[in-house]
Amino acid sequence: MKKGLKTIWHNFIQKREKVKQYRALYEKQIKQYQQKVAKLDPTTKAEEIANLQSEIDVLQRLIKIKNTKDDVVKQDFDKKNVFEIENLNFWYNKDKQVLFDINLKIKRNKITALIGKSGCGKSTFIRCLNKLNDLNENVRWNGKIFFLGKNINSGIINDLTLRTRVGMVFQQLTPFNFSIFENIAYGLRAHGIHNKQAIHEIVEQALKSTALWDEVKDNLHRNANTLSGGQQQRLCIARAIALQPDVLLMDEPTSALDSIATNSIELLIQQLKEKYTIIIVTHSMAQTIRITDETIFFANGRVVEQGTTKQIFTRPKQKETNRYISGRN
């Protein structure tokens, strides 16, 4: 990415976070960025211009939104939270309800565990947060999910942007059948970054952030599937954070790993919380106690209890919670 465009893009991203609902501010920003697009070097990649234009389009859509109350922008959204969920219900195949009246607030820069028996709705819930469930046919949901104060189902934030800012690491190891380098670079190019130097710098930083760089720096063109299980999972995390998300969703990220690899992933997760909010589905109560700050207990598609991990495991308020953590449920 050209230096000038990179600066414009960086500045716009920074300003985007501060955008309020006032019409005058939207119009002012639209004018500024239209001018910047007009002044870009003619050789600039069309994809890069499109990135800026898409942000302008978002602002223009906001002007058309007459109702800027809680249906779109939550006026009383607590800045300490990253998500606020109100009355969330979810169905598979139109009539099989798996989530019931979920009301939650998830704090920023904390590691929050979702615990509960298999089939209780944890994985379905976590996929609601970046609308991955919406990629499936025959699903529906209602209620409101506010991400940094914005209703994710109102059109104020498009799905691709949401999934970039709310990254996902899955239970199964999912490296692409590419080289180690291309596993990260591919996503960067897909998001309009084409400058080779910039890509190399981002790849290196992502691998360093996941403590993988020193292990693979001399073999970046090796196929990612030849890595060990722990290395593959760290690569998947590096791939997710290369796009600088606000949130990392993790669905049982260590369930397929041995104890040594699990320890390295847990250490990495604790380090990453300084920059990212992490929401993790886990069946390991020992892991929950070791690495998480907050815990949410699900049962039969409902939230039974939410609190600090220490409180949940030492002073649970609900009998059902106590039965579960003591192994009697």
Swiss-Prot record:
Membrane topology type: Peripheral membrane protein
Q: Which SUPFAM superfamilies match?
A: P-loop containing nucleoside triphosphate hydrolases (SSF52540)
InterPro entries (UniProt xref): AAA+_ATPase, ABC_transporter-like_ATP-bd, ABC_transporter-like_CS, P-loop_NTPase, PstB-like
Where, in this chain's numbering, is ATP bound? 116-123
- Tell whether Transport is among the UniProt keywords: yes
Reactions catalysed according to its record: phosphate(out) + ATP + H2O = ADP + 2 phosphate(in) + H(+)
Record-annotated ABC transporter domain positions: 83-325
Q: What is its EC number?
A: 7.3.2.1
Query: What is this enzyme's class at the first EC digit?
Result: translocase
GO MF annotation, one:
ATP hydrolysis activity
Where is the protein situated, by its record's location annotation? Cell membrane
- Kindly provide the name given to this protein in its UniProt entry: Phosphate import ATP-binding protein PstB
Recorded source organism is Mycoplasma pneumoniae (strain ATCC 29342 / M129 / Subtype 1)
Q: Which gene encodes it?
A: pstB
